[in-house]
């Protein structure tokens, strides 16, 4: 192989964080010759902030990444040291699988998967510039002068894009603590005409767990039976640990109030907007100062690591103030601070500059994923990375992009929110963002998305086999329970209280009743005892939601019709009579591709949508007439 060939790829992914790893893996699985460009191999898969994966809404994203044969779920299963299913007492649609993770195990597991992936080469070095041929991406220039040629680029810069760390009055350029920022790429993106903004996130101090008074604290245990993220994980084998729980005190709050002027957040040093749902401890005291305390979870960062992450006291106060704060918190009075908490500002691009494939509208072949799009969180980044990497590979191969709809995945909800509405603060996934969350459950992610992964060629043979085995078992169990039925009178004999209407009900129908599960039905039909535990749970959840799903299907059908109604690329929004100038301007700026996207533009009313549809039909008629005229001239 010549040196020129060695530096030529189909897809180049810049950044080795959660978005970058998923993007590189997805592109390589799709058959693209892929390069992952990162400063150092040993930083691939680093958990920059909280050592945890999943949670409410976020756990759904991890399951969807896994259903598409991504990495995060399998890596988290290997590294998880405290698995807990959040919202366990609520319905399955809003339950959130979560685990604390051993930072080292997570990083090493991710690096192993990246190393073992076919078609994927890790290139150590900093990305200095993007190379374009006209309005199409054609390569990446590295800081050492090497030029990598490609057909598509996925940019996953995280907090590195003009990153600036703040600790009280101190501030210095960094991508995260101890690592250099990416300084040249923002200027290149501005030269392309992109709109850049500044966002902020923060992290708490790190503590020496050996100096914490664990005996005085309440402890929280892992679930007795850990539930894995991945279909490919049979059971969790990593030892499980406890974490401690403490609270801030009125004395803590007094110290924070007295030093707000020294906080980078409140001194005016920080321009960027921080995440609403992950506030700094300063924010908590300013906005919720009437509370007598705020909860802190003391999360060990590894099985053989004494570092503890105090979840709940993210801060940009000076180091000396952070030390004073620790002395006022029960159990932390003698805690040794290993690293101060800090805030970090970074550049991001208005995600309305993107298509739903995550390709930029201005530069063909340039895809963005993760915090550069205004999101926060490993899970949001990983999900975007997978979609961007897949579509980058398809762009390089000349194939149509994969678009996930709001009706089929939380990934689709997130991408649609970002590209149609933009962000005014870091975007975090919640189940409440999805209109059809009864359909988009964590437990059925494989059923929703694995067939798609198979169709587009990113599914391994091992996963296909396991998925089909599980689906066959569920299909058989469904068929059996639907074939067995009972009258209300006979059901009463087994202490099942049904409406005495004379209508026979199947075992499947009975599972939709809140107080009836498979254990109770085995007393009537002993053959149901042969259904394995995994299939049993899936069947019970499916039956429980069956009635609601039938009702929701009509709403889904309406949205899918709107998604299919495309807006022609040549449509002149200025020519739509009756549409306000403000809406015309917004439509020209956003360039919605479907009626469903247009409906989510701020200010779009039903009347405005009707005008738009009428213009599309008129445009379609003119296009047809023009084609017929050309055809007639050709015949003459």
Curated annotation (Swiss-Prot):
Q: Which residues bind FAD?
A: 15-20
Which of this chain's residues are annotated to bind NAD(+)? 274-288
Gene Ontology biological-process annotations: tRNA methylation; tRNA wobble uridine modification
Q: Which InterPro entries match?
A: FAD/NAD-bd_sf, GIDA_C_N, MnmG, MnmG-rel, MnmG-rel_CS, MnmG_C, MnmG_C_subdom, MnmG_C_subdom_sf
User: Is tRNA processing set as a keyword in this record?
Assistant: yes
Phylogenetic lineage: Bacteria, Pseudomonadati, Pseudomonadota, Alphaproteobacteria, Hyphomicrobiales
> Which cofactor names does the annotation list?
FAD
Q: Which PANTHER family match?
A: GLUCOSE INHIBITED DIVISION PROTEIN A, PROTEIN MTO1 HOMOLOG, MITOCHONDRIAL
Pfam families (UniProt xref): GIDA, GIDA_C_1st, SAM_GIDA_C
Q: What is this protein called?
A: tRNA uridine 5-carboxymethylaminomethyl modification enzyme MnmG
Q: What is its main location?
A: cytoplasm
Q: Where can this protein be found?
A: Cytoplasm
Q: Name one GO molecular function term.
A: flavin adenine dinucleotide binding
UniProt keyword terms in alphabetical order: Cytoplasm, FAD, Flavoprotein, NAD, tRNA processing
- NCBIfam families, from UniProt? mnmG_gidA (TIGR00136)
Family classification:
Belongs to the MnmG family.
Task: Give Gene Ontology CC terms.
Answer: cytosol
**Function, in words:** NAD-binding protein involved in the addition of a carboxymethylaminomethyl (cmnm) group at the wobble position (U34) of certain tRNAs, forming tRNA-cmnm(5)s(2)U34.
Q: How does it assemble?
A: Homodimer. Heterotetramer of two MnmE and two MnmG subunits.
């Amino acid at each position: 192989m010549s040196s020129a060939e060695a530096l030529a790829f189909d897809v180049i992914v810049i950044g080795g964080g959660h978005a970058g790893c998923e993007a590189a893996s997805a592109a390589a699985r799709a058959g693209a010759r892929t390069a992952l460009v990162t400063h150092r191999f040993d930083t691939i898969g680093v958990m920059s902030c909280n050592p945890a994966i999943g949670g409410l809404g976020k756990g759904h994203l991890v399951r969807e990444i896994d259903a598409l044969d991504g990495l995060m779920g399998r890596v988290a299963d290997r590294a998880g040291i405290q698995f807990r299913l959040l919202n366990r007492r609520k319905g399955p649609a809003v339950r959130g699988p979560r685990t604390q993770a051993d930072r080292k195990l997570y990083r090493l597991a991710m690096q192993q998967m990246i190393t073992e992936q076919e078609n994927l080469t890790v290139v150590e070095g900093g990305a200095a510039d993007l190379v374009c041929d006209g309005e199409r991406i054609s390569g990446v220039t590295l800081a050492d002068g090497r030029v990598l040629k490609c057909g598509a680029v996925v940019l996953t810069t995280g907090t590195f894009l003009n990153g600036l760390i703040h600790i009280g009055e101190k501030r210095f350029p960094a991508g995260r603590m101890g690592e250099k920022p990416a300084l040249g790429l923002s200027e290149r993106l501005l030269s392309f005409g992109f709109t850049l903004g500044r966002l902020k996130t923060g992290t708490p101090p790190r503590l020496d767990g050996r100096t914490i008074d664990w005996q005085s604290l309440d402890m929280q245990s892992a679930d007795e039976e850990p539930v894995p993220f991945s279909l490919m994980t049979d059971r969790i084998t990593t030892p499980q640990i406890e974490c401690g729980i403490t609270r801030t005190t009125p004395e803590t709050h007094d110290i924070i109030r007295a030093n707000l002027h020294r906080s980078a957040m409140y001194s005016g040093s920080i321009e960027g907007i921080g995440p609403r749902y992950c506030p700094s401890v300063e924010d908590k005291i300013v906005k919720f100062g009437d509370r007598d305390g705020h909860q802190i979870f003391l999360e060990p960062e590894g099985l053989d690591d004494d570092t503890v992450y105090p979840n709940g006291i993210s801060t940009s106060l000076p180091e000396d103030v952070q030390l004073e704060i620790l002395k006022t918190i029960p159990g932390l009075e003698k805690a040794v601070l290993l690293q101060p908490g800090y805030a970090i500002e970074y550049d991001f691009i208005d995600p309305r500059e993107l298509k739903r494939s995550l390709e930029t509208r201005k530069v063909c072949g340039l895809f963005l994923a993760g915090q550069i799009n205004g999101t926060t969180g490993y899970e949001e980044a990983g999900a975007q990375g997978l979609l961007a990497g897949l579509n980058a590979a398809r762009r390089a191969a000349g194939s149509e992009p994969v678009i996930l709809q709001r009706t089929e995945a939380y990934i689709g909800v997130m991408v649609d929110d970002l590209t149609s509405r933009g962000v005014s603060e870091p975007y975090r996934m919640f189940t409440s963002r999805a209109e059809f969350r009864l359909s988009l459950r964590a437990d059925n992610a494989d059923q929703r998305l694995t067939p798609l992964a198979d169709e587009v060629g990113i599914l391994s043979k091992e996963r296909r086999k396991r998925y089909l085995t599980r689906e066959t078992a569920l299909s058989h169990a469904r068929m059996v329970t639907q074939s067995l039925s009972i009258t209300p009178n006979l059901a009463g004999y087994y202490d099942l209280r049904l409406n005495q209407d004379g209508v026979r009900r199947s075992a499947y129908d009975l599972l939709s009743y809140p107080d009836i599960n498979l254990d109770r039905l085995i007393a009537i039909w002993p053959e149901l005892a042969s259904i394995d535990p995994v299939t049993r749970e899936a069947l019970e959840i499916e039956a429980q939601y069956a009635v609601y799903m039938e009702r929701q299907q009509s709403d889904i059908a309406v949205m899918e019709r709107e998604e299919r109604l495309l807006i022609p690329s040549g449509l002149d929004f200025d020519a739509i009579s009756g549409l306000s100038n403000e809406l015309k301007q917004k439509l020209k700026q956003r360039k919605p591709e479907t009626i469903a996207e247009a409906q989510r533009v701020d200010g779009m009313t039903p009347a405005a949508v009707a005008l738009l549809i009428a213009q599309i039909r008129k445009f379609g008629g003119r296009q047809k007439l023009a084609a017929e005229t050309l055809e007639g001239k050709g015949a003459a």
